[in-house]
């Protein structure tokens, strides 16, 4: 077998590239991160961290390191030019185990992501390496980089070989240009100036989106006493004006007394972008993060969208590297992630349009907001963050719940016959393609732990209230062993001890999980399934009645291009695009 320098070359040491390398390392594979700079970027860019990203950081074993640099339950208020609150975004549920929104200090978080690579002997971060060449050689890639001194002098040129390469080097991505894919979308002409200050002169912990017709602004309370302001520049204001201290003081004077006394940490200008690459894959080369899509900042989803990319791609690369799946599995990365990234861009662009309305449009907006706030259903739509598009994978590594066929999964699900005599199902929607919940649970070894700590970071087959092996034939059990599928039985806490005794002699090990909070019972109670198969990224790959388990697993094998027990080479069964 040919030996390569590493398994995956990651181009760019931003949060996406570092997270991807950590996720590859935690699953036992090698990754080399090449970064053109000689150090991590030391100024904050992203300021919002959501529960999905935290779940990923927990999977990577990094959340405990990162948590001290965050503020949970970051409340966001949209206010008009007079300061009246038009809408409040303050979700308090924790479906995925963590508060829905956090503020964070990105440079400190990025340092922890970089330090996390030291845990793995097969991962490394190389600064001062600017990638200048890519070559797809069929069974591997060759990545060429110039090693330059901090003064810019060329020291050496190196070429690394790897099974795959992933470009995570931002919006001006060399990798994307090498791939030759279109970067579709638009870049609005509006420019913004960002100011970060120490010793927060306001001291409030939340976020204000100022939809002020005179000059839209953003004011954000961040950890460690940092305050961020963002101000829109008018078309007749040159960018160079931001270098004038008097101009900057005039922007800040409406928000804080004595702006000249502020301790400015960082100041810069930027332009919002809304773009997405036409494809996230070309052969053995992939795009992730800003290299794949540029996200307007309004909902704080740029950082989080990139982490979703890393979460999705990392387990698929790991499966192929371990010969658990064929290369065809990697085609589902672009299939699954591109649509959601595009949807998130659209929502962010709409939010920006609401912020930038003129006097007449702003007045109409304020009237509409007042009317919507009178209707609890519509008010909660904003308060509970229900307008945020949640990832739902309709094509890819999914099995349709109604037909148990691979590659596509319809959101709607109609119960039929007498097979699922449930009533008031959750909106008649299938859970397939959605992220599974993460309550705190009990086991024989620990109490009150997060579900992911029990199920782990690979495949899980779970049933409610029964022994999952009762529904599996010999071929299914062989599949479970081959792909290290964890078998789990969710039980009411009152039945956990009984189940542990009862299932002790089952043909495969079963982890019994006590549902101490009732969250798992509530989840199954309104869904027409008694069995779920969870992917390594905690999304539901299949859901069915317990007796349908063999059909669901057979379809999953095809949807994920998984290898079989007897195959010498990985199978290459196609997945619907």
What is each of the regions a protein language model found here?
Residues 2-7, 11, 27, 83, ...:
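Helical substrate-recognition/capping region of FAD-dependent monooxygenase/halogenase enzymes
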Residues 4-6, 153-164:
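Core beta-strand elements of the Rossmann-like FAD/NAD(P) dinucleotide-binding domain
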Residues 17-18:
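N-terminal Rossmann-fold NAD(P) dinucleotide-binding loop
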Residues 242-305, 325, 347, 390-391, ...:
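FAD/FMN-dependent oxidoreductases across multiple families
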């Amino acid at each position: 077998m040919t030996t390569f320098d590493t398994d995956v070359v990651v181009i760019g040491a931003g949060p996406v590239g570092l997270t991807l390398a950590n996720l590859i390392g935690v699953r036992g594979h090698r990754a080399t991160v090449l970064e053109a700079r000689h150090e991590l970027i030391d100024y904050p860019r992203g300021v919002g961290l959501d529960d999905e990203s935290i779940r990923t950081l927990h999977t990577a074993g990094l959340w405990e390191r990162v948590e001290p640099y965050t503020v949970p339950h970051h409340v966001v208020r949209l206010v008009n030019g007079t300061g009246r609150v038009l809408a409040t975004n303050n979700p308090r549920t924790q479906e995925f185990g963590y508060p829905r929104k956090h503020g964070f200090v990105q440079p400190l978080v990025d340092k922890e992501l970089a330090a996390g690579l030291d845990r793995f002997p097969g991962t490394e971060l190389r600064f001062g390496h600017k990638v200048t060449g890519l070559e797809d050689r069929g069974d591997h890639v060759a990545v060429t980089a110039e090693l330059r001194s901090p003064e810019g002098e060329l020291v050496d040129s190196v070429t690394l070989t790897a099974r795959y390469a992933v470009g995570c080097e931002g919006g001006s991505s060399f990798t994307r240009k090498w791939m030759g894919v279109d970067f579709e979308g638009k870049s609005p002409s509006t420019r913004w100036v960002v100011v970060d200050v120490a010793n927060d002169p306001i001291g409030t912990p939340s976020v204000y989106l100022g939809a002020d017709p005179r000059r839209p602004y953003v004011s954000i309370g961040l950890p460690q006493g940092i305050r961020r302001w963002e101000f829109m520049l008018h078309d007749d204001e040159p960018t160079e004006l931001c270098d004038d201290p008097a101009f900057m003081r005039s922007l800040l004077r409406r928000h804080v007394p004595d702006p000249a006394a502020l301790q400015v940490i960082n100041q810069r200008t930027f332009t919002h972008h809304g773009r997405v690459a036409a494809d996230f894959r070309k052969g053995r080369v992939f795009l992730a993060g800003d290299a794949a899509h540029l996200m307007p900042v309004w909902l704080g989803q740029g950082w989080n969208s990139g982490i979703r990319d890393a979460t999705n791609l990392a387990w698929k690369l790991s499966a192929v590297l371990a010969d658990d799946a064929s290369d065809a599995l990697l085609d589902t990365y672009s299939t699954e992630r591109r649509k959601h990234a595009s949807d998130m861009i659209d929502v962010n662009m709409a939010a920006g349009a609401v912020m930038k309305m003129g006097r007449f449009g702003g007045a109409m907006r304020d009237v509409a907001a007042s009317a919507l706030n009178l209707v609890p259903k519509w008010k909660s739509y904003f308060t509970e963050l229900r307008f945020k598009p949640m990832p739902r994978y309709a094509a890819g590594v999914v099995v349709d719940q109604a037909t148990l066929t691979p590659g596509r999964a319809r959101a709607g699900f109609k119960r039929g016959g007498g097979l699922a005599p449930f009533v008031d199902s959750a909106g008649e929607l299938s859970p397939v393609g959605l992220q599974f919940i993460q309550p705190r649970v009990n086991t024989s070894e620990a109490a009150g732990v997060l579900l992911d700590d029990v199920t782990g970071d690979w495949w899980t087959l779970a049933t409610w209230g029964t022994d999952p092996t009762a529904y599996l034939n010999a071929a299914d059990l062989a599949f479970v062993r081959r792909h290290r599928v964890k078998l789990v039985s969710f039980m009411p806490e009152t039945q956990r001890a009984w189940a542990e005794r009862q299932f002790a002699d089952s043909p495969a090990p079963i982890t019994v999980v006590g549902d101490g909070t009732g969250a798992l019972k509530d989840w199954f109670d309104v869904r027409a399934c008694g069995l779920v198969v969870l992917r390594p990224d905690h999304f539901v790959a299949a859901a069915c009645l317990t007796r349908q388990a063999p059909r669901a697993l057979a379809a999953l094998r095809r949807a994920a291009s998984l290898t079989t027990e007897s195959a010498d080479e990985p199978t290459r069964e196609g997945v619907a695009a």
